[in-house]
């Protein structure tokens, strides 16, 4: 039982550690959701020479033509129409930040996702953040208790207590993690519809941080189930061994005929004490007709000072041998 219990404890510790690593990584990264955003192309006034009517080969042809009317107040303009006026840029978002790639450059521009969320959803987002933090803290507590259980593996009672507390903390952390992930998903979907115009995604999907978060939840629940299973199996094995141990020392049931008790009591009250030993031997003989028949000068079978005392207890009723 000790080896199997230690093996189950090691499995629970490994699953809990994996859940903790996944949860911490997902909490600190910005790839919960990723996709593309549709943004306008730069106009002529913003350095977009390719979009200007006088760029390239058209510049010579248009040099003798009438000048093109400029847009009012020098605002940028573009001759493209429809979807050609837009281009797609990639973005990725986490709990803390949302980052978009820079157009025409290798870098990224990041801004706080909490600021991007609608005012009606900021409370839910903060609740999600708090739940994620509690989720990680409870995972740490459960992991510590499981490690203590491994240290106290020689003591069954102490191990069971630590096992029970570790299972409770792990289950609670899993529930908090599930609620936190679902709340963040809800906030992101609302932000997609009601967020700032310059941020709203054209298309999006869940990223690897989101997969890590739910993988952490899966490992956490697997660790809790393993811990509960270890606790249950240890209790059942312990009770079974105790039951077998008690049955090994339990006295066999004694069935005494009330009429025989009355008969022996009347004989003794008449003063026929000389037959008391015969009554005792008869009791032994009747009780164990094959295994324990007394023989003069012989010892009892099954080796037996202890068993002889047991027979005496079984035949002694109301102060007399019966």
From Swiss-Prot:
Residues annotated as transmembrane: 9-29, 123-143, 164-184, 208-228
Keywords, comma-separated and alphabetical: Cell membrane, Membrane, Phosphoprotein, Synapse, Transmembrane, Transmembrane helix
Phosphoserine sites (modified residues): 274
Pfam families: GSG-1
InterPro entries attached to this UniProt entry: GSG-1 (IPR012478), PMP-22/EMP/MP20-like (IPR050579)
Keyword Transmembrane helix belongs to the record: yes
Expression across tissues: Expressed in the brain, including hippocampus (at protein level).
Record keyword Ribonucleoprotein present: no
Residues in compartment: Extracellular: 30-122, 185-207
GO cellular component, as recorded: asymmetric synapse; glutamatergic synapse; postsynaptic density membrane; Schaffer collateral - CA1 synapse
Cytoplasmic side: 1-8, 144-163, 229-322
GO BP: regulation of postsynaptic neurotransmitter receptor internalization; regulation of short-term neuronal synaptic plasticity; synapse organization; transmission of nerve impulse
Main location: membrane
Subcellular localization: Cell membrane; Synapse
Highest taxon listed in the record's lineage: Eukaryota
Membrane topology category: Multi-pass membrane protein
Subunit organization: Component of the inner core of AMPAR complexes. AMPAR complexes consist of an inner core made of 4 pore-forming GluA/GRIA proteins (GRIA1, GRIA2, GRIA3 and GRIA4) and 4 major auxiliary subunits arranged in a twofold symmetry. One of the two pairs of distinct binding sites is occupied either by CNIH2, CNIH3 or CACNG2, CACNG3. The other harbors CACNG2, CACNG3, CACNG4, CACNG8 or GSG1L. This inner core of AMPAR complexes is complemented by outer core constituents binding directly to the GluA/GRIA proteins at sites distinct from the interaction sites of the inner core constituents.
Function comment: As a component of the inner core of AMPAR complexes, modifies AMPA receptor (AMPAR) gating.
PANTHER family: EPITHELIAL MEMBRANE PROTEIN-RELATED, GERM CELL-SPECIFIC GENE 1-LIKE PROTEIN
Assigned protein family: Belongs to the GSG1 family.
Protein's name in the database: Germ cell-specific gene 1-like protein
